Regions:
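Beta-strand elements of modular eukaryotic interaction domains
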Residues: 1, 18, 45-47
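Short, well-ordered loop/turn sites that connect or cap secondary structure elements
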Residues: 4-6
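Short beta-strand-centered aromatic/proline hotspots
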Residues: 19-39
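Non-transmembrane, membrane-adjacent beta-strand/coil modules in membrane-associated proteins
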Residues: 38-49
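Intrinsically disordered, low-complexity, charged/polar segments
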Residues: 47-106
């Protein structure tokens, strides 16, 4: 996502493989901040250590997801991408970021 404005609608994907598309959800871009302690992954930790900001996304389901934890973009683009993948036979799976973070710790 290139130009972004606080309040822009966004979509966030955890990932996709040959069988599934893992959707974190849709929400809004809330700005650039240093990821909080709950953000998972090596890049999130690096951002905290180096005090580097990262895109913060507030999803409609209440979850806060950081750009470094997912693939994200404008809502209409993500919806179109998901539709293309599902149209090719992939199964759509909704994932909560807390569950993904726990699974990544294992």
């Amino acid at each position: 996502m290139t130009a972004r404005t606080v309040g822009d609608r966004v979509g966030a994907l955890l990932g996709a493989d040959e069988d599934t598309v893992q959707l974190l959800g849709y929400g809004v871009y809330v700005g650039e901040e240093v990821p909080g302690a709950s953000a998972g992954g090596t890049f999130a930790r690096l951002c905290r250590v180096q005090k580097m900001v990262n895109p913060k996304l507030q999803l409609d389901n209440g979850d806060v997801v950081w750009g470094c934890e997912c693939w994200w973009g404008r809502e209409e683009s993500v919806r179109a991408h998901v539709q293309r993948l599902v149209g090719k036979g992939r199964r759509l799976v909704e994932v909560r970021i807390a569950d993904a973070r726990k699974a990544a710790e294992r």
